[in-house]
Structure formats: structure tokens, C-alpha cells
């Protein structure tokens, strides 16, 4: 029972946002939003989620995780209930922000319920599964989306999300976790830390989301947001550095071992953008809509599930790096395969094998990564756990945002480059180009009698094909870049394994000599 409740709660934490993300184009049309405006809807979810992680650990210590989750769920249900009747853009932003805030305690609560279902002997396998099941919400959302969303009436979706929150609340109240020791840990200074860091992280999220839309060099707003983010974050860390009982252990942030872990965790999350950004947006650029992704995300769902099961079954405290190395190798191979396959004829079915491998890799590395981070943290003290939770959450949230922002920027630049390159190769006097234009013009003549207009339409059709081919080449470029990063991580992992083996052999040799 604990296992079923834990899985349900963990998946529900991200399911609603996943469905909204899958249907952003429809929501944009529903509320008549610009691309910049609609991008704020998933952005505020991440902002609130990062902010909630600042409060979560101490809230669990002082009030209990169940109490914190119940209050968060009640607030979310209230806002969701209002949203059923008041469907507008500001309310959509408020609901997504509340959803992001609630998702943080729900994912932790789901983890604890799953772990409670395992005996102490297999508790760490429960940790692997508890962390992994929350990721299943994204593919599940895309699979369910066509059956829940009606562009003429969004009430069904909002009612469904309200029902999920209600079910989670009922489960938490009916089946309680064992009581944990509660201690007074909050200080008044924690409020100032939160007021500095939460908006700082929020502004940074906003910059990453809006950068490739408003364009980095063209919008003064992005500059002001970035300056504000840096000022708030630096002030927050400076304030924490000189506190007697800091929320964040700033001195630990300077250690080499921690930064090696942070960079590795960040890059592991970034290379998963090959799936979440590159392949999905390539297929969208070919005209596919959300209902045509059901089979694609079904494959991803089972890939994640398979990776989760294999990760739990092959668990070993002494061998945490090998699963991550295997994961990077799978992503590198899948990226090379995808980059060399892109054409205008490609459909989701062509990506099933590679994306199953990427999804498998994503679940395979998560458990060992978390366990490695906790081991690094507990070597310091329990007081360092909050710092780890914030850092790990930041690597995963910002890794995804940076991946999307970086690849989106690169895709736009490479599209323009390839478009200019194709146009330079196409001379207007070229017989092939002339013949193609004549074919297009002949196709328009039955509906357009004016010769000049039919010529313009023919030229426009040719330009659309040029743009499409340039986009295909650009997506191939960003997937190739992703393969380079994955290959670097694979090499880094192999070096670490070899180094560890070398040190162990030297220690064994020294013991034999003595």
C-alpha cells in the first residue's frame, strides 16, 4: 500500500505541469498569448519549485513533511478550484506557480512512502525507485494528454488536475507515515535568506526561458533581470556566509569534490535535452502535434521504467560510477544515430530505438547520482543536507533550462547559417531551380490566375522548403554537439574508474609489502 501511494503521489507531483507543457501551443491560442507570454507558464513552475526546496528540509524537521504537504495541497486545491471557473492567463500563471511549489514536497513525500514499503535491507533500492518514478510523469502526461484536452473546453483538464490533488490529499491523510522527530530549526534570519535567494533563482529562470525568445542581445529586460538575479543571489550567499547557523554552507561550496559533483550532475541533466528539446522540437518543426506523440512517449515511458528497474536490481554502493558511464555512452550513441538520420521524411517511429536508449540512460544514472551526492554530503554533517538538496535541485532544474536555452539559441543561429548557405548555392539562373519554380507555379495556376501572384507563391513555397531543410541541418548540428558532451562525460567517467582502480591496486600492494 505504501508503495502504490508513493508512486501515485510522486507521479502526480509533475503530471499536471507535464500535460500543460505538452499543450502549450493550444494554450497560447486559447488565451491569445505571444511566445514570450506562454513561455512564462512552465517557467513559473520551475521558479516556485526551486524556491520550495529552500524551505523543504527545515519544514520537514520542524513541522513534519506530511503537515507541510497537506497545507501545500490545500492551497493548491483552492487555487485549482478557482481556476476551473476563472480561466484566464493570470490565473494560469498562479496555478502553475502553486503546482511547482506543491511538487517539491510531493516528490519528497512520494519518496518516503516508497522507501517505507521496503525493509531496511532494501531501503536504498527504494530510494532509487522513489527518485526515479517522479520522472515518469512527463511521458505519462504526453500519453494521456490527447484524451484529456479539449481545445474548446479546458474545464476537463483543470477538473482532472484538481481531482489528482484531492486524491493525494486523501491518501496522505488516510495512510500516515511514521512520525519523525521534530525539532525547532527555523530562525528569523532564514526569512531574509529566502527573500533574497528565491527571487534571485526566479529571475535567473526567467532569463534562461526568455533569452532565446526575446533574444539575448535585443532585450534590455533580460539584462535587468540578470543583474537583479546576480545581485540577489550574491547578497543571499554573502549573508549566509557570515551567519552563525547558516541555511546554506557557503564554505563547503568552494570544495573541489562538491564542484566536481555539481558539474557532473549538471552536464548529465543537460545531455538529456537531446530528448526533451532536440528530437521533440525537430518533430514539431515537421508539423507534428501532441496527439501524434503518443507512441513516441510510450516508448520513452517504458525506457525510463526499464532503466529504473535495472538501476534498482544492479545497485551497489561500491560501484556508483559505472552505471553513469554506461548512461553517457548510451546517450552518445543515440545522439550520433539521431544526428545522421534526420530528414524531412523522418517520423516518430524512426526514433523509437534511440529514444528508448536515452530514456533508459536517464533513469539509470539518477539513483547512483543521488546516492553519490548524499555520501559526499554526510561526510560533512547533517547540517549540509539542505545545501545538497538546493544544489542538486538547481543542477536538475537549471540543467534542463540551460539545455533548452543553449540548444534553442544554437538551433536558431545554425538555421540562419544553413539557410544562407543553401541560398548561396541556389542560383536563380540554375536550370534545376527554374524548373522547380515552374512546377510550383503550375500547381498554383488552377487557383491563382494572376501570373505575378502565382510566381510569388511559387517563390514563397521554395523559401519554405529552404527553411525546412536549414532547420533539419540545424537540429542535426545541436544533436551532434550533444553527442560531443556525452562523449566527454563518458571519457571523464572512464578516467575516474581507472584512477580509482589504480589507487585501490596501490593500496593493496602497500598492504602486502607491510
For the regions a language model picked out, list residue spans one by one.
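Interfacial helix-cap and linker-helix signal at transmembrane-aqueous boundaries
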Residues: 27-29, 59-60, 92, 114, ...
Amino acid at each position: 500500500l505504501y508503495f502504490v501511494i508513493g508512486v501515485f503521489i510522486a507521479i502526480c507531483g509533475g503530471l499536471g505541469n507535464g500535460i500543460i507543457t505538452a499543450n502549450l501551443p493550444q494554450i497560447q491560442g486559447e488565451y491569445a498569448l505571444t511566445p514570450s507570454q506562454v513561455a512564462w507558464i512552465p517557467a513559473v513552475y520551475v521558479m516556485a519549485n526551486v524556491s520550495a526546496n529552500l524551505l523543504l528540509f527545515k519544514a520537514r524537521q520542524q513541522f513534519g513533511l506530511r503537515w507541510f504537504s497537506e497545507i501545500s495541497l490545500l492551497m493548491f486545491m483552492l487555487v485549482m478550484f478557482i481556476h476551473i471557473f476563472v480561466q484566464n492567463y493570470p490565473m494560469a500563471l498562479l496555478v502553475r506557480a502553486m503546482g511547482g511549489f506543491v511538487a517539491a514536497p510531493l516528490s519528497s513525500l512520494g519518496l518516503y512512502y516508497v522507501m517505507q514499503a521496503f525493509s531496511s535491507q532494501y531501503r536504498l533500492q527504494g530510494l532509487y525507485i522513489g527518485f526515479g518514478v517522479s520522472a515518469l510523469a512527463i511521458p505519462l502526461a504526453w500519453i494521456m494528454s490527447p484524451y484529456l484536452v479539449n481545445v474548446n473546453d479546458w474545464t476537463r483538464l483543470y477538473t482532472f488536475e484538481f481531482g489528482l490533488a484531492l486524491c493525494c490529499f486523501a491518501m496522505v491523510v488516510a495512510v500516515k507515515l511514521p512520525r519523525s522527530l521534530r525539532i525547532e530549526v527555523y530562525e528569523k534570519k532564514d526569512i531574509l535568506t529566502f527573500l533574497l535567494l528565491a527571487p534571485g533563482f526566479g529571475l535567473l529562470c526567467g532569463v534562461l526561458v526568455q533569452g532565446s525568445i526575446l533574444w539575448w542581445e535585443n532585450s534590455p529586460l533580460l539584462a535587468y533581470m540578470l543583474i537583479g538575479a546576480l545581485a540577489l543571489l550574491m547578497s543571499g550567499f554573502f549573508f549566509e556566509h557570515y551567519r552563525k547557523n547558516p541555511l546554506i554552507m557557503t564554505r563547503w561550496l568552494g570544495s573541489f569534490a562538491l564542484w566536481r559533483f555539481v558539474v557532473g550532475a549538471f552536464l548529465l541533466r543537460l545531455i538529456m535535452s537531446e530528448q526533451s528539446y532536440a528530437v521533440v522540437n525537430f518533430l514539431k518543426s515537421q508539423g507534428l502535434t501532441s496527439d501524434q506523440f503518443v507512441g513516441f512517449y510510450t516508448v520513452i515511458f517504458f525506457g525510463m521504467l526499464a532503466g529504473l528497474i535495472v538501476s534498482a536490481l544492479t545497485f551497489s554502493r561500491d560501484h556508483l560510477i559505472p552505471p553513469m558511464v554506461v548512461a553517457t555512452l548510451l546517450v552518445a550513441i543515440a545522439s550520433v544515430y539521431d544526428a545522421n538520420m534526420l530528414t524531412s521524411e523522418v517520423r516518430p517511429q524512426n526514433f523509437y530505438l534511440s529514444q528508448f536508449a536515452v530514456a533508459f540512460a536517464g533513469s539509470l544514472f539518477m539513483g547512483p547520482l543521488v546516492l553519490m551526492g548524499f555520501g559526499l554530503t554526510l561526510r560533512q554533517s547533517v547540517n549540509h543536507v539542505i545545501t545538497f538538496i538546493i544544489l542538486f535541485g538547481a543542477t536538475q532544474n537549471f540543467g534542463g533550462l540551460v539545455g533548452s536555452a543553449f540548444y534553442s539559441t544554437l538551433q536558431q543561429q545554425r538555421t540562419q547559417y544553413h539557410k544562407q548557405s543553401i541560398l548561396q548555392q541556389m542560383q536563380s539562373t540554375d536550370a534545376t531551380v527554374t524548373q522547380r519554380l515552374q512546377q510550383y507555379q503550375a500547381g498554383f495556376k488552377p487557383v491563382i490566375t494572376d501570373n505575378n501572384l502565382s510566381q510569388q507563391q511559387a517563390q514563397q513555397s521554395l523559401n519554405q522548403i529552404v527553411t525546412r531543410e536549414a532547420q533539419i541541418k540545424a537540429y542535426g548540428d545541436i544533436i551532434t554537439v550533444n553527442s560531443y558532451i556525452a562523449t566527454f562525460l563518458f571519457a571523464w567517467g572512464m578516467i575516474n574508474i581507472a584512477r580509482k582502480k589504480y589507487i585501490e591496486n596501490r593500496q593493496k600492494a602497500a598492504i602486502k609489502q607491510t
